[in-house]
Amino acid sequence: MRKRRLWWFVVLFRVTLVGAILPNETFDVRRYYADRFLIEDEENGSSRSYYISAESKAKAAEQFALLAPNCSLTSDIQENTCNETSSFCDHRVDSTYKTYHYEQEKCNCFIETCDEETNSTELMVLYPDCYCGKREKHCDLSKEKCHWTPDSDHDDLKFEVFESSNKVLFDYMLQAGSEKANLKMNKVSMVSKFFRQSGFNCSLRFMHHFTHQSSTSRLVVRSILQSGEKKNLYEHWLKPASVFWVPVQVAIGSYAEPFKISIDCETGFPPKKKKNKPFTCSIADIYFENCGEIRDPIEQCSRGDQFLCSISANTRCLQNAQCDSRIDCDDESDEMDCGNINGTMCDFNGQDYCNSWYQVTNVTDYHERLSEPTTVAPLNKLNEVPLHLFRLQSPSAKIKEAMRGSGNMLVFDHKPNPLTRRTSALVSPELPRTNPEAYDEKSPLFKSCKLRFYLCSRTYSKVWQISVISKGINPMESGRTIIYEAGYTLIPKENCTWERVFVNIPRQNAGFRIGIFVTNYFPGSEEYVAIDNLSFSPTCFERDINQSTWDIPDLFINTCGASGFEQPQNCDHNRELDGQTGHFLKEDGTQQWTVPVTGFYRMEICGAGGGSNSKASGDTGDCVTLQVHLIENLSLRMLIGQMGESPCFTEHDDELRPSSCSKISHNYVYDGKRGAAGGGATLLTVEKDLWNVVAGGGAGASWDGFDMEVGYGASAIHVKPDQRCNETCKAVSHTDFIVERRDNRCPGEKGESTVFGGFGGGGNSCGMLGGSGAGYQAGNPFGKSRARSGSSNVSIDFSKSPIYYQSERLDEGYIKIAFCRKRCEPPTVCRFRKDYFEEEYCGCPDGSNVTDTEEACAFPLVCPSSSTNQYRNFTYEPFCLCNNGKEIYDVYNDTCEEIQIWTLYNITFLIFAALTIIGALFVVYHYRNREKQMKQEILDLTQMKSPDYLYDDIYFGRTTRKAALDSLPSISRDSIERGRVLGRGNFGEVYYGEYSGVKLAVKMISRTFSASQASQSDFCNEALCMGTFVDENVVRLIGIDFEKVPYMIALEYMEGGDLLSFVKECRPNQVSLNPFQLAMSDLIKICCDVAAGCKCLETFGYVHRDIAARNILLTTRGPQRVAKIADFGMAKEITYGTEYYRINGRTMMPIKWTPPEAFIDGVFTTKSDIWSFGVLCWEVFSLGVVPYPNRRNEEVMLMLTEGARLEYPYGIPTRVYQLMRDCWKTAAADRPKFVDVVEIFQDIQDDPASVGMPFPIHPAVRATFAHSQSTPVSVETPMTAMTEISLNSTFTDASTVKVSAQQDMQDRIQLHELMLTREHPYTSELTSYVVNSIRKDLARVQYENGLTSVPQPEYLSPENNDESVQLIPQSNTVTDQTPPTSLIDLNRLGVQNTGPTLHRPDSLNFNDPYSSVPLLECQTR
């Protein structure tokens, strides 16, 4: 009799070790089979056989008793005997367990269980989807054939059967709910019958439509054992984003004891008041699936993405659930032994995102904000700090939690709304290489390495992405592979639905990182992204992985399928094959590779061959094989040469030979006598301006005859062309290895028939001669044999003893890189033998063989005591590194010279210290004797001022102050939509606002200052000034509100911030020498705007008194910026005569922006603003350097009084500095008016010689920028500090300054003469009194600060009248930062703020070179 066998379990005690990881190593397979029946049905359904594994027949009888009716024990139990034909014989049991057999005469899915106490029976189902005959898969709710029973604890809440209007999904449905009943913590359920057992793949499927009456409403699926123990299998509690039916699949698993399933709809608490939310719960299409298949769980749950729960009572096969921060097994075995590799699990509940992950942000460009700013910045100082776009957030009404109790999540939702477009990246720590088994098609772990996370998003496309980042690469630079990119997920409602995302991780043969990138493309939009519970599959990494693995794959870098002149376009396929080892394609066609591990590497580098014609083949390229020592994270840039093009002789040759036939000339039918183009060279470099390795390209094939219409290939060194190379030859020759197709085309009509050289500088051909090959020295196209091909070269400081040879194949160029993998015990290192560098061996660092002596592999040099033993990178040559940075290779003839130098330094220091102590004692003694006399002689300037005020009120438009205020536009503060605070101080605060769509900066005086009459006067004065001066270069007044306290002024909002902060941020930084890409014309335009605003003030007869870069605001930081004058708190109208007025009383003023007549006589005129404007121009062109660096205010006053002026900033146009000197004339009458200044600047803007000058970047800064890119060499510390630049080279005498190629020497001479020109000293009745008082005050301040040993500069001596004395002491001492405006009380001449302590920097600070080095072109003597 043929039998149809249904196997629910197959193997009793076989554990299959698959790959590197088991589904669950703690699973008890014997216990699993002792609790479950194996069932076999006859093919015709007439009988059914049961098998059980037990220790004895009696134990088996206890199990089979559940199957016998009427509670009677059966004696018809037999021990099963295996034969070869029985499929059960393939699966043996151990000696303690045997298999027993019991047979029933018919198929039966129902079991009558008895209760001995009540002597009653209850119907139980064998397993959930058991059937005999025709299968009733779906529960027809209209009939009584279902294994389900409704239950409810409320009379108005019961399930009723309804016929579905949509027959496509289902025919009938169950629905329970009530609109009027007061439902509070009630429940309506559908409960199944008890089932004897189930398979481990058993699941329940149904559809539900659930309407919440409150946030506590939920739908729960539970399993209930006979003992009453309950377990939640599924929970639905989130409010739906749509009104559609939700299909559900609930994993039940394999139960070994009777159980039943309950679908519970819980109402929760009633809804809040005034909210009518009826509760409804609808269920349809209920059925079980795969519940009888009790197969061998280990064999059936053995894939890499599966996990078998270890409890035999309820065994489940989980999919993508192991190590995902969520407990799915009752014994928590799915989350055991997880997180061994740092950073592979992240639930975002920590304080720093997750374990070792970090966030970086890159500002990409500037743009105008589209909504209210949330970045707090003062109105007059835009100190912008990059804000990260990702942040941690707890669940909210907008974004619910991904799972119950999951906690914080990673969110991007534009809340920071930064002023600039930026990109943030959440970057993982360095991860080891991926498990090779996960990428082997024959392995059960194939395609199991995934990145898993929960996602809730509402975004446009490409707003965020997940990428693989190669080891050692800056996350914001190129060299990353996108593995997941956001699509268009903008949904109509605010709430989004969480979904689980699985992303395949490409194979990684070396260490790598994962980065989650987001860019705020659309500021102010309603986009948001939420990510939670991010984890890697445990099969991604080997269990015993060594994170510093030596298993580095060989790397083969080719042209990525490109040929001829076309640059490589796509190398993704190659990157996938080599396992993402840090190799990627750059925009210019070069390729970059990052060294994964420090050690020796073998490189085989070959140039490309030349093109061929119908007569001959082109020459092959050159090859170089070498050995080089590379350090980890070093970037190598490579250009792979491509074959030169071959001429097309028919219209279809390009189809037959697409890789080398000239594509541009296929419409031109040649006469057959044409030359081919030369091959490109293959190059490698670790420096920007030097090719360390050049493998020459082969020459293109030539035809018989001679012509001169042929070109040279590119050359790394200068090549003198052959005398036969005419102008045409020179025109079609290459000067660079990276050339574009349109360059060096053949002249005239033959331009369309150019046969182009291969990428990498191959020479073009225009006639019968073939183009020469590119190389270290390009080949001569007029030469013979190999002289026409390019030569090869390896720089001596990159590799020693390279092997040069000619390639045997006419092919594209390539580079092969192999790592020396042999593990060697220190001090030996893995190296390659010098015969073709193929054999690996463990040798001494210098390449010699290891001996058994004590001196084996000893350092070959005896270094001085003040030096350390080092090995040079690349060549691995030994040398001694002195403490002063000097490198010694010949220890017998060279020394560090450090001991002698330091001895001299110590002696000098001791002498200086002794003199300092003696001088200090003398000054203290002298000061004590004259202290009383000095205090009596200090001049009180208030006694020298006229006691009469020159004005009692300020008149605007010849009206009273009140009338002028009444004429200003008024605005109600209640109509302003208030935003964030932009700035706050003692006077009050400034906040952002919007009024009728107009952006405002609202300034409010505090209540304390509102009570002061003087403060009210100043506040009104500022409003009157801005309301009177209506000009495009003056900040516009929108309105005022003086009706109630605190007073309010509404001004136009200036997004660009203050001018001083802007020019400081224009300085070179570590990323760019010109961050804002400014030109000289931009700086001139800013100064012209300020002059135009001052012209408006001059027209009205007002003096601003505080013209400085800090008081100038910019409309934007982009190219359309306009500078406007602000802060009129010190502005006064001239009411005495028509030209000036005199101040009296305690007056504070910015000394470094003030002319001599102001701080000596207290006289301010419009010419005073002219002086201040000249200092402002100096600030702009010096990029925010404080005027008169390192000078106290007292020193500045003495300098200006004696006729000294500021030096010119580096790179300033001569005409601009001439105008600045005109503004600083001693006599106010000699200074120009602002009308004249505006005309001069307009003329300068039309002068190409001025506006065409480069952006002023000091050579010291350029040198520092270049040195910052270098890689110092050290075996022990490979990443040392940047090479120090001597400050003495920065400050040179004018006669030694190198002449710039962009500026005429005559202009430089004129600039220097202007700078050396000394103005007439300022003299008045008060000059001598003020100067003497300043000298005394300066001496007193020095004594109080303990500076008694500081010698007095010569120019401070009252007896010194020699104008040749240096007014600006020659010193490299500079301030660490630009000090705030220093103010001097003219009545007491006491220094209020002298700035930070002076110090001498040890090296050039590249982070802010303008604050550490005064960028003056030369020093004055």
From Swiss-Prot:
It comes from the Eukaryota. Probable tyrosine-protein kinase receptor which regulates the dauer/non-dauer developmental decision probably by controlling daf-3 transcriptional activity in parallel or together with the TGF-beta pathway. Regulates integration of conflicting sensory cues in AIA interneurons. May act as a receptor for hen-1. In AWA neurons, together with hen-1, plays a role in regulating olfactory adaptation by controlling the forgetting sensory responses to odorants such as diacetyl. PROSITE patterns: LDLRA_2 (PS50068), MAM_2 (PS50060), PROTEIN_KINASE_ATP (PS00107), PROTEIN_KINASE_DOM (PS50011), PROTEIN_KINASE_TYR (PS00109). Changing G1174E: In sa249; moderate decrease in dauer formation. Partially suppresses constitutive dauer formation in mutants of the TGF-beta pathway. Defect in sensory integration when confronted to two opposing environmental chemicals. Residues 300-338 form the LDL-receptor class A domain. The chain crosses the membrane at residues 904-924. Keywords: ATP-binding, Cell membrane, Chemotaxis, Disulfide bond, Glycoprotein, Kinase, Membrane, Nucleotide-binding, Receptor, Signal, Transferase, Transmembrane, Transmembrane helix, Tyrosine-protein kinase. Residues 976-1261 form the Protein kinase domain. It catalyses: L-tyrosyl-[protein] + ATP = O-phospho-L-tyrosyl-[protein] + ADP + H(+). Pfam families: ALK_LTK_GRD (PF12810), PK_Tyr_Ser-Thr (PF07714). Residues 925-1421 are cytoplasmic. Its EC number is 2.7.10.1. Residues 1-20 form the signal peptide. Glycans are attached at residues 24, 44, 70, 83, 119, 201, 342, 362, 495, 533, 546, 633, 726, 793, 849, 873, 893. GO terms for cellular component: plasma membrane. The lineage of its organism: Eukaryota, Metazoa, Ecdysozoa, Nematoda, Chromadorea. This is ALK tyrosine kinase receptor homolog scd-2. Its main location: membrane. Coiled coil: none annotated. GO terms for molecular function: ATP binding; transmembrane receptor protein tyrosine kinase activity. ATP binds at L982, G983, R984, G985, N986, F987, G988, E989, V990, K1003. Interacts (via cytoplasmic domain) with fsn-1 (via SPRY domain). Belongs to the protein kinase superfamily. Tyr protein kinase family. Insulin receptor subfamily. It is found in: Cell membrane. GO terms for biological process: chemotaxis; dauer larval development; regulation of neuron differentiation; sensory perception of chemical stimulus; sensory processing. The gene is scd-2.
